[in-house]
């Protein structure tokens, strides 16, 4: 599998607006875009060739809401950009690595994403993302 870079670090937050304001006012990170995916509202803030992704759950059934309620706000996952997510998932399956997503699904900015089960990674949630050409990072 070819990992191109750390695409983003995701942080689960209680208030997206408060967190965006903090990142902007404290670190000078601009908001590139906000997006709603299912029961999660997210914001992408560029840092060099990577992003900070802020995630706020939008209801009690949201995985982010459950995470924040159980563990509090904080680091949620790391995302690696890969060239070919289908090949990456096939390679992981061949190595016996347990996946949360057997097939890619659509995530932030239209990226094809999949998560590895944290039980296989030392309890770190890892996302793989294949970015479309029109994606924010692909046009940078």
Protein language model annotation of sequence segments:
Residues 5-7, 26-32, 36-39, 59-76, ...:
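A cross-kingdom feature marking solvent-exposed beta-strand/loop segments within repeated
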């Amino acid at each position: 599998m070819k990992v191109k870079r750390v695409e983003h670090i995701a942080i689960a937050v209680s208030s997206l607006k408060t967190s965006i304001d903090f990142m902007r006012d404290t670190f000078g990170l601009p908001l590139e875009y906000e997006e709603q995916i299912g029961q999660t509202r997210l914001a992408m803030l560029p840092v060099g060739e990577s992003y900070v992704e802020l995630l706020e759950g939008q209801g009690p059934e949201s995985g982010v809401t459950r995470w924040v309620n159980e563990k509090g706000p904080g680091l949620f996952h790391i995302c690696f950009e890969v060239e070919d997510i289908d090949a990456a998932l096939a390679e992981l399956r061949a190595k016996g690595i347990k996946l949360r997503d057997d097939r890619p699904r659509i995530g932030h900015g239209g990226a094809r994403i999949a998560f590895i089960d944290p039980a296989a990674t030392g309890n770190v949630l890892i996302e793989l993302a294949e970015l479309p050409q029109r994606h924010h990072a692909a046009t940078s």
